[in-house]
A protein has these predicted regions:
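Alpha-helical transmembrane segments and their immediate juxtamembrane cytosolic regions
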Residues: 1-227
Length: 227
């Protein structure tokens, strides 16, 4: 269970809406050859980074609100495995080896131990942000190594591919920024429950089912001659 904060859930819901729209456009552009020039250029990349960073920061922050970290981590692990198995057998060209849910699962697991340490969270927050910047491009290109066993860290060769890829470097540092912020940034401002906050509370379920639904809708519209 997690202590709910409608403002946090609203922000998460906003990120979810952005993610669904982004993936809809992604499917249209890269699977149906729909031409959206801005989406394929810098604005699309910035939008994608904004969505990912939002999710990771909020997840790190919410670590402090969770009452059962082990249960949450196990839930993320199950969802991550479902995503890997489903994409391997039914969408192999988009097989997810280590995507954002895998990252959040491992980040939650590691942070269970980090949370037991006596650390100055403000200093750790600054150091984590600096390390995020310094390691940002580590996983941007393949390395001259013989194995992909450490692809979850960010080290892989040119034979590696993952349809969604968020390794520990640099992304765990962004998770730590959110985690540390949750210790000294006590968000007391709250809002009334709304559509976005309701979506935020169901974000994991929406993440799990939104892509198949989008693909089905796109194919139906395509069949009817709308694309």
């Amino acid at each position: 269970m997690m202590k709910r904060n409608n403002l946090i859930d609203t922000l998460r819901g906003f990120a979810i809406v952005n993610m669904v729209i982004y993936h809809l456009l992604f499917d249209l552009v890269y699977m149906e050859n729909f031409k959206i020039e801005w989406f394929e250029k810098t604005p699309g990349m910035i939008w994608e980074r904004f969505i990912c960073i939002s999710f990771i920061l909020i997840s790190g922050y919410c670590f402090n609100l969770s009452r059962n970290h082990k249960k949450h981590t196990i839930t993320l692990f199950i969802v991550a495995m479902i995503l890997s198995v489903v994409t391997y057998f039914f969408a192999n060209e988009f097989f997810i080896v280590f995507g954002i849910i895998h990252l959040l699962c491992l980040a939650s697991f590691i942070t269970i131990f980090v949370d037991k340490l006596t650390l100055n969270k403000k200093i750790l927050c600054v150091l984590s942000f600096v390390m995020f910047i310094l390691t940002y491009k580590i996983s941007a290109h393949p390395m001259d190594i013989s194995t992909n066993l450490f692809s979850f860290v960010g080290f892989y060769n040119d034979k590696f591919y993952s349809g969604d890829y968020f390794p520990l470097l640099p992304w765990y540092f962004m998770y730590l920024v959110g985690y540390c912020a949750g210790d000294f940034l006590d968000i007391k401002l709250n809002v009334r429950e709304n559509v976005l906050s309701k979506m935020g509370k169901k974000s994991l379920m929406i993440y799990l089912i939104h892509q198949p639904i989008i693909m089905i809708i796109v194919q139906i519209v395509k069949f009817l001659g709308g694309i």
